Amino acid sequence: MRVAVAQFATSSNTQENLATCIRMIKNAIECEPLIIVLPEYCNTQAEHKNHQQAWDEALDLNGEFLEQIAIQAKLHKCYIMLNVTLRRDLIRDEQNPLIKSNVSITTCIFSPAGELIHQADKQTLQACESEFFICSEKTTDSVSTPLGKLGILAGTETLSNKNTRDLAIHGAQLICNAQSSQSHAQNSLYASAWACDNNVFIATANKISHCEFVKSNKAMNSNGSSQIVSLNGSVLATLANDKEGIIFADIDIEKAGLLKHQRPDGTNFIDQYRPELYQQLALLPKSAHTAALKSKLPETANVVLFATYKSNEQAIEDVCYYIENNLSDIIQLPELFFISDKSITNNAQQLIEIETLCSALIKQISTVLRPFQYVCTSLVINGAHQAVLISENGIFATQQQLHFCKRYQWTALGNNLKIIVLPLEQGSINIAMLTADDASMPELIDVAALNKVNVILMPFDIQTSSEVNFSLLSRAAEHKICIVASSREKSFLDEQSSNDISKVKPGNMKKIKPQKSTGLVVDIVNANISISLDKLKVKQQHGKITKALVHPSETFKSF
């Protein structure tokens, strides 16, 4: 099916805005879409001087503005989604412009029959919006149509994966997102991450600022960047942030949705998802613990990603040699770092031999570690796959794998995320460890952030390039949390190329070069600002040894 997105400016003149909407709908119809997505605040602008202005510029649900949009939907036989401000009372009794009216920011969907089939009030209001607008009871229901199931978001609701996830859990396959946003992260990072995490397409229609408004308030000029994002996070179509226009893309909505979401090893999402695990409440007392944590948080910690190319005993010796000749606080190794072919773990006899080797390597590595120095990896202990932290005294902490995956279907699963206080030479930090597919569940990072984790250590085996290109970056940005993740190097087809693989002629297949992907270190350098991709300090794992600094003290500012 074809999806079209319109990007344009609005003014404070409602009739002018209606004319603009109709003009852009007619422009979009030229590409023959089945659904057209329009931006946020189609009838007005986001800023208001007082409550009287907010009321005057808001629409009646049965008024001319929406009636004309309904006519366009019926005339062109397509779905039209737009976001407007709606009056929720018949009249405004108050004469005082400083007294608030019942006005909502509402997204409406009109069917090809010209009927209003869905309306949803914006739930995540910014401070300036809360002053003028209300929101009704939240709904996370997807909208069932002959095309597929649609999910509706507006504005800053896309800054959290939770909103997209809630819609996806309720069956959404295409997220229609109306924006009037300045956030670069929403367009450059979050949309791609949320699409990958939830196996949904995301069509975002953003605003450009009206010329008169730009002159009066240049700082509020919207970033625009309307776009359509595919299931793998690749951008199918985008529009420059200062241009009025239409973009469109053809999507296969039958492939979308969490019910059809699979990991590369064939593990189904529904076999991994564990809602009971994400209900874990904050484990630590807030006020007293926070004060104590702040007083002893180290400013920095030295970390290294170490990915040996060797196997078995030689791999262990390789790690020990590095430890003896370096002073890193935390040496992060990949998942089961000494095994190149993880499939051998599915052989019962070999699994016993692997566990024996794991016991030996704990002793061997601990003998060369200095005080306040640690190695993080994953091992097989007591028949279970688990992340481990090794100190000079042996095992310091363990974290059993929490989510099922076919790669390690033999392992028992843990039932809670452990929050570990890790002593370093300059103080202590809170850490959590994630291995296998655990980090693919954003809810688990929510639990870590709720419990004031400064650094997440990840011994993992990368399965898709989107994990490091989008997902892990978005986790760090959303929660302002440092991530240290190490994997053996893998090669994947470029996301855009793989998205269009059916269009590639057989003779040109060799021209599509696989892209190498590994782990990374994501550092938070200034938690006082709104974090976007360009505000994260990211160091990609390169070669055998990748050294980096992380700043746990900056993560505290977000608690």
Segments from the language model and where they lie:
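Short, acidic/polar
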Residues: 16-25, 160-165, 313-322, 439-446
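Cys-nucleophile CN-hydrolase/nitrilase-fold catalytic domain and related Cys-dependent amidase chemistry
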Residues: 14, 22-113, 117-122, 181-198, ...
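Conserved hydrophobic/aromatic positions in well-ordered beta-strands
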Residues: 4, 108-110, 227, 247, ...
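Active-site catalytic loop in hydrolytic enzyme cores
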Residues: 59, 88-173, 179, 183-189, ...
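Short beta-strand segments enriched in small/hydrophobic residues
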Residues: 1-9, 290-313
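Active-site mouth loops of central-metabolism enzymes
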Residues: 9-16, 152-158, 307-314, 435-436
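CN hydrolase (nitrilase-like) catalytic-core segments centered on the catalytic cysteine
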Residues: 58-82, 159-247, 354-374, 440-538
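RNA-binding accessory domains that recognize and position tRNA/RNA substrates
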Residues: 144-146, 242, 254-300, 317, ...
